[in-house]
Amino acid sequence: TMKLFPAIVTLHLLGGMALLALLRGQSVAYELSEPGSPGPTALAAGTRRLLIAVFGLVWVQIALGGWVSTNYAVLACSDFPTCQGSWWPAMDFRHGFALWRELGMAHTGDALPFQALTAIHYVHRLSAVVVFAGMAWLAWLLWRVPAMQRSARWLVGLALWQFTTGLTNVVMDWPLLAAVSHTG
């Protein structure tokens, strides 16, 4: 990835995730078309809207995580819950989120400032709080539908897995097992 633009690598990740989502959607449609299938579970309109919103939030979070990874910004914050000992560290959003640039370079051609890496990492971290809250709320609503309790358990388990592996990456200086687990 050293020779590729971070935007290209991140878009490649999102393309792979879109393919995975489409394959899963096709799998569910196939399962529901089987004879003897109980059919789809009806969800309240509010739960369906929240499901779509959480899907969108997760999609943005995956993009932000890809941006952290492709910019090698994971070690910009090496403490938790603060970053560099601050609740709001020095950040450079303009350079950190300039999409079309070479790896490690600002769009001006200069080296990417450390504050840009901090901005990339910290935005991913803060958005994780929003995503985690949305997933917890959705899991609670799904738990109230007996046919969706298994899905609710999976949702909680995956959210906790992402939180744990993300935290492990920060406090243990990016061990390979945690990095791979958080990515996949």
Indicate where each model-derived feature is located.
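Polytopic transmembrane helical bundles with strong interfacial aromatic enrichment
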Residues: 1-184
